[in-house]
A protein has these predicted regions:
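Membrane-proximal interfacial segments on either side of biological membranes
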Residues: 1-98, 113-270
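Central antiparallel beta-sheet cores of small beta-barrel/beta-sandwich binding domains
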Residues: 5, 103-105
């Protein structure tokens, strides 16, 4: 702990060592990453407090190697307990609002604003990809930019984010996440139960208390209506274009060629 002061200003620097608990993080995040994240890890916090004639402001730098935490997310977001991942977060604010910026291993980013006196983030943005895209324009957005991945392992996480961001009628039941604005994905190659889609684009957004999903790829152009207000209603799928490529079919030319053995008798061809 260090501090300095003069007749007008006072500044304090405080270094804190704390422990990041995955379950506590999940609970405060309304269940997001439940079943994916576990364990505990030490974090170092460098807190700077400034009291000036113009008002109060602060800045907290949070760093950790996240050793002790385990991630069961799909690759490249899967992490063993002993594997180091760099966590670098900054929380800064004044007597009006607070800005949160977080990056994990330069693969995951979270940015949000929390106004003083409010219990819910605004302009929140989860980014899964290599580039930090900053704050969202409103509410909660999720951006997924990956070269290739499988769809099924991500479904539960997407459902957790949608559930956490649902805007309940009872204000007391609202959590820290704002209502969902959209989930946007751009994936070079998507594997959905061995069906392969190239240059895959997805946009999921609320529509009159339900969810509408727009899908585009080289092999697909479709819209999906998912009822959430009345779950007894059927899911409606409308496709303008669909061509199904299976992973086995893509590998077929190589596989068939490999079936020709070097010692095969081909004398009958001459």
């Amino acid at each position: 702990y260090t501090s300095d002061a003069n007749a007008e200003d006072y500044r304090a620097n405080i270094n804190i060592n704390a422990q990041l608990d995955a379950q506590t993080l999940i609970n405060h995040g309304q269940g997001i990453l439940d079943g994916y994240l576990s364990g505990q890890s030490d974090v170092d916090i460098a807190l700077e407090l400034n009291f000036t004639e113009q008002g109060f402001n602060y800045r907290a730098q949070v760093k950790s190697d996240l050793v002790g935490l385990t991630s069961k997310l799909p690759a490249p977001y899967k992490k063993a307990e002993t594997q180091p991942w760099v966590l670098d977060a900054v929380v800064q604010g004044d007597d009006i609002s607070n800005l949160i910026t977080t990056q994990v291993n330069k693969q995951f980013y979270f940015n949000a604003i929390l106004e003083n006196g409010k219990s819910q983030f605004s302009n929140a943005h989860f980014i899964i990809g290599k580039q930090d895209l900053g704050l969202n324009s409103q509410d909660l957005s999720v951006t997924i930019n990956l070269e290739q991945t499988e769809l099924v392992p991500w479904v539960d996480l997407i459902d957790q984010i949608i559930s956490a961001a649902q805007n309940e009628d009872d204000p007391e039941s609202q959590g820290i996440m704002p209502p969902l604005n959209e989930i946007v994905a751009n994936i070079g190659m998507l594997d959905f139960s061995s069906m392969v889609f190239n240059d895959f684009e997805m946009r999921l957004a609320p529509e009159q208390s339900n969810v509408y999903l727009k899908l585009n790829a080289k092999e697909l152009r479709a819209g999906v209506f998912i009822p959430t207000s009345q779950r007894s209603q059927p899911i409606r799928f409308n496709a303008d274009y669909l061509r199904v490529n299976f992973a086995e079919q893509i590998e077929a030319p190589i596989t068939e060629a490999a079936k020709v053995a070097p010692d095969t008798d081909l004398t009958w061809l001459t």
